[in-house]
């Protein structure tokens, strides 16, 4: 139960930057006790001369509803002796120079539908969750050696009703979940759902950090959506923006007439690129606000993780000719990750960082930032640049494919083809591909196949699964009419089977963060733009051979070295006719020959598809398996397992072991 008045300990921890449930102190809370009921409001406004409560319950006249100042640091509170659930409200703040500001509650749990901006008293309690099996399953598995394919989407533009209205959170549970499950995705990632005034910002310029946007329903409706996802076996990750916020007059900006949540120095405060304000990450009260917010989404909405947006904008001071590290941001991110993993060691904390900042996913006690995953922006940019290169010129850009393996194990990576790559004139993924209509599809199938075979978890933005031709338009739904066209249907089928193949074979994901899981067979064939490599699982002898051809030239009887003396079966070929390809496949088992080639004792002769990927798997009899496992063991002996980055500092080492487990040396 919420106390009628803030406790001294709560207030102290808030001002120390260590009140991680500050949402229990601030905001609007219905309180009950002794047969009475009331509603407590609490707000932080350190520069205010006076604060009044206004709303639909007092005709927006705060004369008789002044808040009491709790301390000199600006905590104000009032208890209204009524149950005000469902009522609109704002804070009327009198600044030191006498100006009157009407502000929404920074800790509001629900807000009016835009363009209106009032906060709404809402009791979050009362929803009955049914996701206990999902939570138990999460605790049993280490996330690092599990398959992960994320479906990234914008809630308002995935699909719309015939009259153009949004689907609600509850309606989307029926529409979205079966679609995502049918294609085999393991998680969905939602562009920001905090309350935000402008649709065009996609949610990245928010101001109501504790208020799930009312565009699609109520907080309980969103709980229902997440609950349904978990019951279906889908994880839910949300985009979260702790670096900057919108400057609309009703929001956080100059909250009490002076810089409150933002930096005092204008050069540090103003984010001129996005037209927003940067959070003052050195201010303890702001840290309490933001870290509590992450824990709030975990506690009340059961989300499984966060993709932390624009980490580079936090790590470096903005608006400087040279890049200077922001020590407040570094300390904040470490404190954030420690707090999150102390709460739940199975959370996904994903950094969207475009810089080469070292050790983003390394332990905080060892100087790292403490995330457990990072988007691999370097791989994404190199691969898209390579694929946009005319095929006959790709031999001159060969290292754009191979370079990523030089740093693939420096962090725990996710390979993203995200919303950022299909907007602002960048073209859709399909339209980035050069060549004819059919060649565009072939190369996109190849690109997706290579992404699945490359070390790292995977992310694909909505519409890419059926090769949307146009860029993403936030105000329109996806081009579902494309399912009327054969190659788009076949692309969708290919993505289904590709993800199923990825999830079926453990070498694709078990050693994503261990160098033993990948080995080049031939990385030097620039002339033909052909790459071949091995992916390995934890079990000795569990291997896949992958061959990628980035030109339109097919090859027969092509020699590829293999690690085991066994026949090989092609488990997937992107050029299969069922996917819209030309049919250059390996329909029969491929025998391995005992002739050394490319540093291996064996090789096969196979068909290489044009603009295609072929995935081979050895077919072994039980008697052969032990012998082959011994050969593989001899080959990899001495290659050392890399322990994925742990996350806690010295005082959280026990939590760290719970997160990562023990990885033995080899």
Curated annotation (Swiss-Prot):
SMART domains found in the cross-reference section: Aamy
Biased composition (Basic and acidic residues): 622-634
Reactions catalysed: Transfers a segment of a (1->4)-alpha-D-glucan chain to a primary hydroxy group in a similar glucan chain
GO cellular component: cytosol
EC supergroup of this enzyme: transferase
Gene that this sequence comes from: glgB
Cross-referenced Pfam families: Alpha-amylase, Alpha-amylase_C, CBM_48
Its biological purpose: Catalyzes the formation of the alpha-1,6-glucosidic linkages in glycogen by scission of a 1,4-alpha-linked oligosaccharide from growing alpha-1,4-glucan chains and the subsequent attachment of the oligosaccharide to the alpha-1,6 position.
Protein name as annotated: 1,4-alpha-glucan branching enzyme GlgB
Annotated region described as Disordered, given as residue ranges: 622-666
Entry keywords, A to Z: Carbohydrate metabolism, Glycogen biosynthesis, Glycogen metabolism, Glycosyltransferase, Transferase
Any one GO molecular function term: 1,4-alpha-glucan branching enzyme activity
Annotated coiled-coil segments of the chain: none
Organismal lineage: Bacteria, Bacillati, Bacillota, Bacilli, Bacillales
Origin: domain of life: Bacteria
Active site: 309, 352
Thermal profile of function: Optimum temperature is about 39 degrees Celsius.
EC number: 2.4.1.18
GO biological process, alphabetically ordered: glycogen biosynthetic process
Quaternary structure and partners: Monomer.
Pathway(s) this gene product operates in, as recorded in its UniProt entry: Glycan biosynthesis; glycogen biosynthesis
UniProt similarity note: Belongs to the glycosyl hydrolase 13 family. GlgB subfamily.
InterPro entries assigned: A-amylase/branching_C, Branching_enzy, GlgB, GlgB_N_E_set_prok, Glyco_hydro_13_cat_dom, Glyco_hydro_13_N, Glyco_hydro_b, Glycoside_hydrolase_SF
